[in-house]
Amino acid sequence: MATDVKSENLVLRLWFLMHRDVGLFRLCEDQAYGEKGLTMEQFTVLAAVKQIGPPAGIIQIAKWIGRSPNSITMIVDRMVKAGLVRRTRDRTDRRMVNVTPTSKAENLFALAIPAGWKFINKVMSPLSQEDRLTFARLLETIRYEAFEYLNPGENIKAMVAGDDKSHIKMAERLFHDVMLSAPQGKRHVGKKKL
């Protein structure tokens, strides 16, 4: 019986830590991105649009971020008012709304990427490469269990395969964007290789 109590206490501790850390990370991201003119939510929507490929639908953005379409619609409403995105009706399905970033958003996003990257590296710096890989696998395991809870009977293996491809693609794009945003990266843009 004592083992069950210890086990349950550990589960509650992990749950509490996850919630608390997510909140803390969001505050840090808001600060880092805020210095560049974006909120964490705005940055995340722009990252989703960039990953999906503009234009991106509200439902696509919501799925990519892991939020409800209603919450994304409210964020996009505020982004439209701030001049960060344009909203258009899909030509093939008028019920669908697409989101495209403005040049203002593109500029702010480019400035915010290095700030976010600096924060991410700072937070992850105490972890070895092996610890990071283990941490990623553990978080993915929990994510897939949560996905299965919300979507009983869905093909989790297909989701895992899709996530693997998506993560590689996203990492390549973010690395490219970070390098172009860095001062040394800007010097090499447009130069021909000999």
Go through each PLM region and give its residues:
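N-terminal leader segment of winged-helix/HTH proteins
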Residues: 1-36, 168-194
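Pre-recognition alpha-helix immediately N-terminal to the DNA-recognition helix
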Residues: 13, 17, 24, 28, ...
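Short, locally clustered residues in the helix-turn-helix/winged-helix DNA-binding domain
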Residues: 19, 47-53, 113, 140
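N-terminal helix-turn-helix DNA-binding core of bacterial DNA-binding proteins
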Residues: 27-68, 82, 154
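Charged, amphipathic alpha-helical coiled-coil/dimerization segments
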Residues: 77-140
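Terminal interaction helix/tail motif
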Residues: 114-194
